[in-house]
Amino acid sequence: MNFDELSSARMNEQLITHPKYNGVYRLCEPIEGKQPDGAWVMGMVYQDVDTLIKYWRPITMFGKFSIWEGGE
């Protein structure tokens, strides 16, 4: 599935910035078994990036070329 298809399929997803990686991430599905309750409701996500990156894996990063996968 390419980026345009993902964008069309997830019109409600938000973009977040992450200062550590100097980029903007488009979020996809929560990491299996990692997301806290209420993390993904009608396309809304945590605004606290420190909390967010523990539970979510971005699929696209704008800025530096990098892929980050979260979960500890």
Please provide the spans of the model-predicted regions.
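Mixed-charge, Lys/Arg-rich low-complexity intrinsically disordered regions
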Residues: 1-12
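A short beta-strand micro-motif
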Residues: 14-19
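Intrinsically disordered, low-complexity, charged/polar segments
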Residues: 52-72
